[in-house]
Amino acid sequence: MLQIRLRRDSPTETGNGARPSPTETVTVACPDHLVLADLPVAKGIGSVTPTTVIKPVGRRSRRQLGERVHFCVRCDFPIAIYGRLIPCDHAFCLECARSDSICYLCDERIQKIQTIKMMEGIFICAAPHCLRSFLKKLDFEAHVHDLHGSLLQADAEKEDGNQSDVQSTMQQSSASESTLRAPLRSQLQQSRELNRSASFAKSQSGFSQVQNYPPDSDNSRPPGFETASPKPGIRFPDYPQPMNLMQPPSLPVPMNQNPGLPQQFGFPSYPTTESGSSQQFFNGAQYEMTRTESGGSEQSSLLGYPPPSPMTNLNFQGSYPPPSWNPGMAPPHTTQQVNRGRDGQSFGWPQENRDGFGQE
């Protein structure tokens, strides 16, 4: 028998010099089954092994990856050792097979329980409400073809349908990828030709618009400085044209550029007097432009303009009042000017006085 001795250490000596008591030894007897079992607890108190060995029990430790495992339909655990019932051929785990005298599935009385290990091999039919077990593969295949042929046909049709669907989807995906990756050359050529024609048409339209624009009129000239060539749609009276329309810059330019138009619509443009002669808005007084003596040649020469030539008389006719070049002097409304306007139909006024507007 194994004996264990426990000894208590003596305390330290005190100052009075008392002797310690003798050590006490306690003997503990250990049963024989603990010694035979060679347990780590019997070898020492409180010692722990550095590694714990875990050994999985049953089929799981020896089966390969991807291999199927049968589950017991009664306890819903993986089966390590089968208990095959005879005569119904239903298979359970060994514990569930021994737990009752009748079958759990068909309630048939159990005559014998056949023990089959995991590695020996067993075939169980997975058809609904069947679950019969077979020890040989030929017997299992014969049972399936004889009793469950309809299930095999349905499974084959489903597999064919799935394969056809997969193939159709693959073809559609490949067709879509081909159209996305490489379009037809004819389509590319047509698109390029359309783009070129559109760009060419735009360029032609732009050139035609530029060519169809009328020439811009010269707006740099101030009002009043126009060419002496008459417009085709306007008739000028038989008056002599002025020789030079250039004026000194000190003189204001008349804003009314349109010459007098001929009488239209059959009625006179001027009111008539008792004597039958027409009277203008300003009593027919005719004005002439300032000559070079009044403007002075020094002013025009200093500003860079050539001295203008003598201007001829301009007779303003029309329904609009003529502008006055001398805003400080207003035309007098006298009967003498009226008579002068009627008498002076010629051009020149040789006996006039410029300061008095024709008064003698």
Curated annotation (Swiss-Prot):
Residues 293-304 have a biased composition (Low complexity). GO terms for biological process: protein ubiquitination. Residues 1-24, 156-360 are annotated as: Disordered. It is found in: Nucleus speckle; Nucleus, Nucleoplasm. It is an enzyme of class 2 (transferase). Residues 1-11 have a biased composition (Basic and acidic residues). Residues 163-179, 186-214, 270-283 have a biased composition (Polar residues). It catalyses: S-ubiquitinyl-[E2 ubiquitin-conjugating enzyme]-L-cysteine + [acceptor protein]-L-lysine = [E2 ubiquitin-conjugating enzyme]-L-cysteine + N(6)-ubiquitinyl-[acceptor protein]-L-lysine. Belongs to the Hakai family. Probable E3 ubiquitin-protein ligase which is a subunit of the N6-methyltransferase complex, a multiprotein complex that mediates N6-methyladenosine (m6A) methylation at the 5'-[AG]GAC-3' consensus sites of some mRNAs. Associates with MTA, MTB, FIP37 and VIR to form the m6A writer complex which is essential for adenosine methylation at specific mRNA sequences. N6-methyladenosine (m6A) plays a role in mRNA stability, processing, translation efficiency and editing. Interacts with MTB and VIR. Associates with MTA, MTB, FIP37 and VIR to form the m6A writer complex which is essential for adenosine methylation at specific mRNA sequences. This is E3 ubiquitin-protein ligase HAKAI homolog. The gene is HAKAI.
